[in-house]
């Protein structure tokens, strides 16, 4: 994801930083204030232009597929299934998974291009307060999330087995290997795309207008929940995930921990679904499911937060720190 960084910008030190910058630095949700010539309407215009770019990219991808489907009857029959099914995870039809996640992945170039066009240099500030995706911290939080969720799923399925439910994985499907490869390649980008939009762009959009982080953490949650077609318990779990991911983004000064949590959560569900241990197409949940997932997410959040403090992970951007990086700061930063 090196394209997320703005590596060609000459650093400029602001001449008159505001008290907010001088005393505490700028927190993640307020980073739009560090872009050149910040205006209240620029983040909003970024979103509108991003939607336009996104639709244009989708057209470029979809039109050739429709033409091929019209010329090849077998492809046409398969393509019709895309509009009839809600079960996108099928080992017999791995292309359905691609059709599900590829449009989400395409949000990344649309957002980054719109951000660069409207707000100018400093696109890397969508990643973190350092102006880049901190790969070492991302790797560490990936390991932490994996450890937490392995324990979580082991407890859940151990409990089910003790209650007499069959929890026998099935490795016999001939399409299993291809599906696993697709999951390992696509899901990290799908998870990152959602984080850049919902925890990156939307948090900084709200933060450019409202100072308190609670607004930036909570206001985007309904949009994230609406993007997932679950019942009330599933929606509650998704909403809690959104709050935890946003809180971690604010606390750690970047998207890395949220991306790690999202990647591992999705990968574990799909990988277990590949061997018939869970139903990866399920849209319903239960109070027990909600409590279990909440416990796993909260454990991850608490440990990641403490680990970040212990390792000295930067959570605010100061003029000096950003000037050493890749961002052009405006002459005056309004708090």
Task: State where each predicted segment sits.
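N-terminal, membrane-interfacial amphipathic/helix-forming hydrophobic leader that caps
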Residues: 1-122, 282-335
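Transmembrane helix-loop-helix hairpins at the membrane interface
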Residues: 179-328
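Cytoplasmic juxtamembrane regions at transmembrane-helix boundaries
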Residues: 117-138, 208-219, 329-331
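Residue-level signature of transmembrane alpha-helical entry/exit and packing/kink sites
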Residues: 39-47, 96-100, 104, 137, ...
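Juxtamembrane helix-loop-helix connectors linking adjacent transmembrane helices
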Residues: 99-101, 123-193, 203-205
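Membrane-embedded alpha-helical segments of transport systems
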Residues: 52-56, 106, 147, 263-269
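Helix-boundary and loop/linker segments of multi-pass membrane transporters
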Residues: 33-37, 86-90, 130-131, 169-177, ...
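Hydrophobic residues within the alpha-helical transmembrane core of Major Facilitator Superfamily
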Residues: 48, 154, 222-223
């Amino acid at each position: 994801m090196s394209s997320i960084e703005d590596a060609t910008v000459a650093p400029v030190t602001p001449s008159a930083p505001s008290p907010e910058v001088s005393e505490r630095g700028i927190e993640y949700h307020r980073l739009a204030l560090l872009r050149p010539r910040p205006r209240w309407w620029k983040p909003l215009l970024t979103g509108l232009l991003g939607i336009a770019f996104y639709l244009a990219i989708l057209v470029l991808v979809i039109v050739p597929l429709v033409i091929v489907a019209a010329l090849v009857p077998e492809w046409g029959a398969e393509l019709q299934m895309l509009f009839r099914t809600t079960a996108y995870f099928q080992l017999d039809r791995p292309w359905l998974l691609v059709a599900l996640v590829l449009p989400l992945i395409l949000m990344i170039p649309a957002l980054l291009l719109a951000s660069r066009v409207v707000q100018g240099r400093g696109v890397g500030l969508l990643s973190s307060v350092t102006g880049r995706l901190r790969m070492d911290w991302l790797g560490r939080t990936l390991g932490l999330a994996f450890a937490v969720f392995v324990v979580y799923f082991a407890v859940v399925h151990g409990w089910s087995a003790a209650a007499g439910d069959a929890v026998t994985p099935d490795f016999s499907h001939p399409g299993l290997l291809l599906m696993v490869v697709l999951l390992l390649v696509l899901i990290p980008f799908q998870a990152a795309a959602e984080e850049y939009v919902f925890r990156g762009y939307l948090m900084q959009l709200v933060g450019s207008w409202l100072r308190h982080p609670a607004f930036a953490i909570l206001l985007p949650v309904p949009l994230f929940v609406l993007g997932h077609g679950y019942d009330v318990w599933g929606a509650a779990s998704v909403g809690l995930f959104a709050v935890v991911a946003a809180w971690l983004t604010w606390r750690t000064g970047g998207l890395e921990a949220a991306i790690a949590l999202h990647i591992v959560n999705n990968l574990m569900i799909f990988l277990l679904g590949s061997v018939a241990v869970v139903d990866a197409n399920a849209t319903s949940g239960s109070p027990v499911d909600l409590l279990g997932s909440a416990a796993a997410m909260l454990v991850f959040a608490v440990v990641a937060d403490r680990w970040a403090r212990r390792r000295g992970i930067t959570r605010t951007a100061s003029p000096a720190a950003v000037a050493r990086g890749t961002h052009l700061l405006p002459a005056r930063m309004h708090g």
